[in-house]
Design a protein with these regions (language model features):
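Aromatic- and acidic-residue-enriched segments that line the glycan-binding/catalytic groove
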Residues: 64-77, 109-145, 182-226, 280-293
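Active-site clefts of carbohydrate-active enzymes
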Residues: 224-236, 265-287, 319, 326-347, ...
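Catalytic domains of carbohydrate-active enzymes, especially glycoside hydrolases
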Residues: 35-62, 175-178, 305-317
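An active-site-proximal structural segment forming one wall of the substrate-binding cleft
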Residues: 40-49, 93, 151-186, 305
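Substrate-binding cleft/loops of secretory-pathway carbohydrate-active enzymes
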Residues: 110-113, 118, 181, 189-191, ...
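Active-site-adjacent "subsite" loops/lids of carbohydrate-active enzymes
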Residues: 12-34, 102-174, 224-237
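The substrate-binding groove and active-site-proximal loops of carbohydrate-active enzymes
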Residues: 22-31, 69-84, 145-164, 233-248, ...
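Aromatic-lined carbohydrate-binding/catalytic grooves of carbohydrate-active enzymes
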Residues: 47-83, 330-333
Length: 374
């Protein structure tokens, strides 16, 4: 399985870059031999791609190289990879072909719930995000077996130190890498994170104790059809704002640490393209010049201060829609529910063309790469 990313419109480019993403686990066996790496890199070069994105830290928190901080993934689904410098070979071959190569890290995740595998199952269960569910109350995310990615609470200081050390180690180990891209640098969803630590840090942020937690954030209720929905509490909007600030602060710190090792390396981020509901994961990837409070009820007037597009050298999004054009979308108005969404969404944001047009607006002219799954 290969995840290609095609480019959206940009300004001041003679030739638009085109990125091809190689997922770690989907391609674990396929890319376990140098001649296979040669074959696929040669192929994407002939197809006109300019960049390859190599996933080096999948969701279980293992990495695809030898590390003093993270366990190395040497086996997946019963297949054991031969012992060679996978990342080093990929970098060398890509550069021989004139391709840029960027390494992708899944950031705030450390386990695979379908396999009970990963660092939050083995060494750091305390890092697991605590989620507030409609039917089971508050519990660790590792107990939600319908959710494959076991996410981590983004604000834990010891985890932030851990993941930043991984970035620094990787860039030092592979100085020829052209850039890194942060993936899953977010909360799991609207249900995260409701740990005691998050409560205390949020109380510090608003300068008062929460009388009724978690219901002062939101309370699960049922609508007329019997479906659960989060009824907003008195602190809901500040909670949404605070989560966006947390992710912004981490992005700022991560960039600082990365650039301290190599000032010329590209610092990039991948997100979903569905901005109207992406607040659910605590991410404001817009430009600071865009004020979402003028369009969306979930945004405070301060929310715009935590737009992080200006921090990035490279920004890529997933436009994962089966409807391509706005014209086709308007014929049927399909309801769309993306991986991070709590409920179904509707509007021209939820087709490939529409999302790209809307992204241009909120990014204030900054370039982005619009992605498709193939």
């Amino acid at each position: 399985f290969i995840f290609p990313i095609s480019t959206a419109a940009e300004k001041n480019y003679n030739k638009k870059p085109a990125l091809m993403w190689f997922d770690a686990t989907a391609n674990f066996k396929r890319l376990s031999y140098p001649d296979s790496i040669d074959y696929y890199l040669d192929k994407i070069k002939k197809l006109g791609f300019t960049h390859t994105i190599l996933d080096v830290r999948p969701i279980c928190g293992e990495v695809l190289y030898k590390s003093q901080y993270a366990p190395q993934m040497t086996e997946w689904n019963g297949f054991h990879r031969p012992d060679f410098d996978f990342v080093g070979y990929f970098i060398t071959k890509a550069h021989q072909l004139g391709l840029q190569i960027h390494a992708s890290f899944n950031v705030f995740v450390g386990g695979h719930n379908f396999y009970d595998r990963g660092i939050i199952y083995t060494t750091h269960p305390e890092w697991a995000s605590v989620v507030y569910t409609p039917d089971k109350g508050i519990l660790p995310i590792t107990e939600l077996k319908n959710k494959y990615s076991a996410m981590i609470n983004p604000i834990l200081p010891d985890y932030q130190e851990y993941i930043l050390n991984i970035f620094i180690e990787f860039i030092s180990k592979y100085p020829a890498i052209d850039g890194i891209i942060l993936d899953r640098a977010r909360y799991d969803g609207i249900m995260a994170d409701f740990s005691n630590y998050s409560r205390l840090k949020f109380e510090e942020y608003i300068g008062q104790k929460i009388e009724n937690f978690p219901n002062d954030i939101y309370e699960w209720q049922k609508d007329s059809k019997g479906n659960f929905y989060p009824k907003e509490g008195k602190h809901f909007l500040k909670w949404i704002e605070w989560r966006a600030k947390n992710i912004y602060d981490f992005m700022s710190l991560a960039k600082e640490k990365v650039k301290s090792v190599n000032k010329n390396i590209s610092f990039g981020v991948y997100t979903g393209a569905w901005y109207p509901s992406y607040y659910e994961v605590g991410v404001n990837f817009a430009s600071k010049n865009y004020d979402p409070s003028k369009e969306y009820k979930w945004a405070t007037s301060e929310y715009k201060n935590f737009g992080f597009r200006e921090l990035l050298d490279l920004f890529t999004v997933g436009n994962y829609y089966s409807t391509i054009s706005i014209e086709d979308y308007l014929k049927n108005h399909p309801m769309i529910k993306n991986e991070t969404d709590f409920k179904f969404q509707q509007g021209t944001w939820y087709c490939v063309e529409g999302s790209c047009k809307n992204l241009k607006k909120i990014l204030d002219g900054y370039p982005f790469y619009g992605g498709i799954l193939a």
